[in-house]
């Protein structure tokens, strides 16, 4: 089978992750990260041929300068690789209700991404910049750009899952509903779980837990999403690195009325100063929480709240599985590496038949997948995610 090389771009507000992946076998030829955009220390780091390299982009550099560097410096050193590029895949955080699957980028698609900016004000504008710069930098691939939406996998949710108990007109007229996030990751690990269990995806019932600086849980029934913890925005749901997740909405009124905080201040509090950072008042890093759980009250407090919330979601989503749960799957930076998070969470779910195997749990870290429960237990798995591969495969499929 001939190779299908795809450039995968993930543009954030102040960074750009990139990789060149062979969609036929998953081989990663180049990967890198440009970061600190708009700052004096803007830099780019990349790996190629097993070696790591780094360079300054220049003070104030952003997406345009980063893509220019990728094209004119990194790929210029690999002309054969550059000549074999067949498509460009773009990760898009929010596609609203308009996009239920990946699509080739057109003017209509660009407008749809713009229309979803209110629901992803930091991410979607950056994605649009990435698309515009890719179209300029790779004119030969102008009709080979593909948008892959984090929200698409969740578009199979039934109405009872995605509607809020608000006036229905807010949904009909303004699109206020649950959309979810991390859909590409939830889809990937669901596929991998089906392979491990030797079961068709359409018959698979799993609960997938994508745990990183942002985190979400998804109920997958018969291979399709039927509920997910993130909502209109990625603020709802689990305790995250700096995001609060679920809370009583009246707290917002109290912060404003009784404490004099502005809407902008409350937004900053809930999105950038809460979660693990808020609970520890030290850091958003789960490694600190895990390393200091036994000795520091702030770490124990944060870990206990984090795992309590996660266990509640897993427990409640079990009720949506029509009487059969094949597995719980952990993925993402925390899900793949924080053995303590997995153990403390599953220990709360003994009633559902989970019993952790300590040795297996400790072994399934640092990129290693595997079963983490005892043979007599209900199954829990660690499966490292690979969102970039899904994006590359979708881009290759749609542009074939």
From Swiss-Prot:
UniProt record, GO biological process: acetate metabolic process; acetyl-CoA biosynthetic process
InterPro entries: Ac/propionate_kinase, Aliphatic_acid_kin_short-chain, Aliphatic_acid_kinase_CS, ATPase_NBD
A Pfam family this chain is assigned to: Acetate_kinase
Main location: cytoplasm
Residues of the active site: 150
Record field: catalytic activity: acetate + ATP = acetyl phosphate + ADP
Annotated CDD domains: ASKHA_NBD_AcK_PK
Site keyed Transition state stabilizer: positions: 182, 243
Protein name, as recorded: Acetate kinase
Function: Catalyzes the formation of acetyl phosphate from acetate and ATP. Can also catalyze the reverse reaction.
Similarity comment: family membership: Belongs to the acetokinase family.
Pathway terms, separated by semicolons: Metabolic intermediate biosynthesis; acetyl-CoA biosynthesis; acetyl-CoA from acetate: step 1/2
Keyword presence, Cytoplasm: yes
E.C. number: 2.7.2.1
Cofactor: Mg(2+); Mn(2+)
Note describing how the cofactor binds: Mg(2+). Can also accept Mn(2+).
GO cellular component: cytosol
List of residues binding substrate: 91
Gene that this polypeptide is encoded by: ackA
Entry keyword set: ATP-binding, Cytoplasm, Kinase, Magnesium, Metal-binding, Nucleotide-binding, Transferase
Domain of life of the organism encoding this protein: Bacteria
Naturally occurring in which organism (per UniProt): Yersinia pseudotuberculosis serotype IB (strain PB1/+)
């Amino acid at each position: 089978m001939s190779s299908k090389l795809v450039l995968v771009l993930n543009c954030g507000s102040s960074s750009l992750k990139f990789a060149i992946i062979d969609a036929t076998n998953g081989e990663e030829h180049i990967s890198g990260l440009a970061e600190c955009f708009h700052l004096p220390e803007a830099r780019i780091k990349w790996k190629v041929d097993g070696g790591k390299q780094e360079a300054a982009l220049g003070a104030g550099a952003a997406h345009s300068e980063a893509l220019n560097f990728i094209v004119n410096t990194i790929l210029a050193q690999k002309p054969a690789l550059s000549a074999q590029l067949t498509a460009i895949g773009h990760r898009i955080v929010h596609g609203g209700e308009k996009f239920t699957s990946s699509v080739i980028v057109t003017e209509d698609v660009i407008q749809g991404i713009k229309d979803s900016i209110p629901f992803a004000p930091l991410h979607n504008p950056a994605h649009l910049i990435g698309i515009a710069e890719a179209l300029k930098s790779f004119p030969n691939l102008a009709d080979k750009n593909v948008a892959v939406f984090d929200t698409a996998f969740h578009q199979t949710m039934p109405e009872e899952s995605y509607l809020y108990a608000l006036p229905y007109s807010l949904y009909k007229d303004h699109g206020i509903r649950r959309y979810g996030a991390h859909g590409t990751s939830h889809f990937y690990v669901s596929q991998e779980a089906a392979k491990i269990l030797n079961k068709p995806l359409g018959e698979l019932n799993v609960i997938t837990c994508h745990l990183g600086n942002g985190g979400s849980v998804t109920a997958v029934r018969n291979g399709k999403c039927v509920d997910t913890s993130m909502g209109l925005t990625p603020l709802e749901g689990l305790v995250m690195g700096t995001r609060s997740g679920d809370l009583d909405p009246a707290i917002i009124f109290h912060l404003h009325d009784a404490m004099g905080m502005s809407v902008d201040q409350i937004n900053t509090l809930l999105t950038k100063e809460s979660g693990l950072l808020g609970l520890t008042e030290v850091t958003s890093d789960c490694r600190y929480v895990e390393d200091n759980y036994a000795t520091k009250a702030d770490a124990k407090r944060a870990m206990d709240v984090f795992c309590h919330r996660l266990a509640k979601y897993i427990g409640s989503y079990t009720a949506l599985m029509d009487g059969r749960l094949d597995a719980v799957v952990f993925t993402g930076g925390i899900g793949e590496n924080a053995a303590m998070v997995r153990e403390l969470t599953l220990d709360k779910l003994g009633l559902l038949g989970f019993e952790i195997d300590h040795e297996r749990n400790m072994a399934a870290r640092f990129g290693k997948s595997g079963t983490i429960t005892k043979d007599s237990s209900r199954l829990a798995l660690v499966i490292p995610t690979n969102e970039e591969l899904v994006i590359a495969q979708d881009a290759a499929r749609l542009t074939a």
